[in-house]
A protein has these predicted regions:
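Cys-His-centered catalytic/binding microenvironment captured across papain-like cysteine peptidases
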Residues: 111, 124-125, 135-170
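Intrinsic disorder/low-complexity segments enriched in polar/charged and small flexible residues
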Residues: 9, 32, 104, 146-148
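Active-site-adjacent substructure of cysteine-protease-like catalytic cores
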Residues: 81-143
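Cysteine-nucleophile protease catalytic domains, especially the papain-like/related folds used
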Residues: 1-93
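Weak global preference for isoleucine
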Residues: 13, 58, 75, 105-106, ...
Length: 170
């Protein structure tokens, strides 16, 4: 699979240098991407996910530092314009919905094969993570993005991982 178009921007960390991704001529090697990486992962698998992650960062004008970040509301634009996602991809804020409505939105997205990118913030910082499943008890499965640390099922009203990596609330 290939993406669409290209994008160039100048992150401040490069002091005037630029990063460019040519999504339309890049073949994303999904078959080589693994659910978990370790010291035994092949170079091809590491390169496949590294290229995707670099392009994801470029697509949202990632601000790189020891705690990198980007604005969440640009993610739908990037998914549609560069990665050929359905135009219906949307940015929604939790505060605009009741608990029941929010749960239904998450379950509907997952049922339709669309994991949900979510974010959380505290005075200590912010972090993006992914809802990629749910169970019969109304718990959502969270991939926190910390190499598997603390992944598991949580209530959306109690997203408190026991151990936290970069961007956690502790």
């Amino acid at each position: 699979e290939v993406g669409k178009g290209s994008y160039t921007y100048a992150p401040s960390i490069l002091g005037g240098g630029t990063l460019t991704a040519d999504f339309g001529s890049t073949h994303y090697d999904w078959d080589d991407m693994l659910p978990v990486y370790d010291s035994n992962s092949s170079d091809a698998s590491c390169d496949a996910v590294a290229e995707l992650m670099l392009h994801c960062g470029i697509s949202v004008s990632m601000s790189y530092s020891s705690a990198s970040g980007a604005e969440s509301d640009v993610i739908p634009y990037a998914l549609y314009h560069y990665f050929d996602y359905d135009k219906g991809v949307a940015y929604r804020q939790r505060d605009n919905y009741s608990s029941e409505e929010w749960q239904q939105i998450i379950e509907n997205e997952i049922d339709n094969g669309r994991p949900v990118i979510a974010t959380g913030r505290s005075s200590a910082g912010g972090h993006a993570f992914v809802f990629d499943g749910y169970d019969e008890n109304g718990f959502v499965h969270v991939n926190w993005g910390w190499s598997g640390m603390s992944n598991g099922y949580f209530r959306t009203s109690a997203l408190n991982p026991p151990l936290q990596g970069t961007g956690g609330s502790e």
